[in-house]
Amino acid sequence: MISSSFEGFRYHKPLPNFYKVENPKNPNNEIPEDLLSYFNELVLKYNFSGLSYSKLSEEFKQEFNIDFDNVIIIKFLMGDNLIKMEKSREKCRLMDDEFQDYGIHVYEFADFLRENGFQADLIHPLADDLSMRAIALQSNDCVITRSNMCLFKDGITVGFFIIHTSIENLPFKSENDMLWVEDFCSTCGVCIDRCPENAFDENEKFQRKLCTAHREGCNDCLLRCPFYKRGYDKVKRRYDRMVKR
């Protein structure tokens, strides 16, 4: 349950200050491997699905006018029972409750890093001026599907929060091994064919203004997506067999 003192994350509202530990005045920039491993275990303990890491490029920092480099992406899988609910305002409310429940723990993770001598600050997950998905793509650990969803290997139902930190020796990835997904999506198209709102134009490009996912909780495209029905690994094996033919 969400603490009664937690204001929650809201659009157009400042990020709640729910930290219990101050940032160190002279933060460390290298984390021991065993401490990072413990941090990962701590995240999993709270039912998150794992961590990814982004090293933001200079071009990206200039584009969004930010001055931090290193980010930790803290991922969770949205509840299957919610995903399978019929679309409604109530479904949207319950999904927001789930999001807030996970979010309060991210302050605890930031406090843990601060206690161990690192600067750690949560990025507002609903920020107007900064794209969370763009930061996630900098990790080389995800791709955007044809249905405009952010796909990690953890699953297509991943939600995430982001902490920027002074830690410079995080296990960043230099290459993205998921780029094959774009080619696979081009051979599928079930999200386009079965969209009840026809939220794709004549060129099969997603039109956000027509999608009712955020207003009503519609996720028909997700429920029919092979990455949801079969999982990343099975789809990858199927794709590899298809390419070899």
Predicted regions and their residues:
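Non-catalytic, usually N-terminal nucleic-acid engagement modules in DNA/RNA processing proteins
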Residues: 1-91
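Catalytic cores of enzyme domains
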Residues: 61-65, 69-70, 75-245
